[in-house]
């Protein structure tokens, strides 16, 4: 399971140094490669290949014929998926194609989220954290009461 947030920089060649903590999990539990794809203009998703295969199968099974929003989302994730392997320095090369689609460039936060990693622009990540911390606790408690989640 991935967890934690790491402030990093993408270098001028598009390389991102993956923290040793994440590389270790990938090496021990998966393969030393990730599939990176575009989720929105604010973040990229990075999955171990085995986890991505599960997600891709679910995406392909979506009923999208009469739902253009879901079809576009399905296409966004599947069409932009790329396999990345790290080099001897523990870096992955984020393609120019993916980098031009997101609204961040160099300063990023790589976040562990259970079965995947998320790559956010630092400003977008900070804004997301501020919003989460500013959410009304009573509204959150109500929303959580409507789920099966037990913390």
Swiss-Prot record:
Q: How does it assemble?
A: Forms oligomers.
Q: Which GO terms describe its biological process?
A: negative regulation of DNA-templated transcription initiation
Tell me where it mainly resides.
Answer: cytoplasm
- Sorted UniProt keywords: Cytoplasm, DNA-binding, Repeat, Transcription, Transcription regulation
Transferase as UniProt keyword: no
Question: Which Pfam families would you find in this protein's record?
Answer: MraZ
Q: Which HAMAP family does this entry report, sorted A to Z? A: MraZ
| InterPro entries, per database record | MraZ, MraZ_C, MraZ_dom, MraZ_N, MraZ_sf, SpoVT-AbrB_dom, SpoVT-AbrB_sf
According to its record, what are the GO cellular component terms? cytoplasm; nucleoid
Name the protein family.
Belongs to the MraZ family.
Which superkingdom, per the lineage? Bacteria
Q: What is the lineage of its organism?
A: Bacteria, Pseudomonadati, Pseudomonadota, Betaproteobacteria, Neisseriales
Supply the name of the protein: Transcriptional regulator MraZ
Q: What is the species listed in this Swiss-Prot or TrEMBL entry?
A: Neisseria meningitidis serogroup B (strain ATCC BAA-335 / MC58)
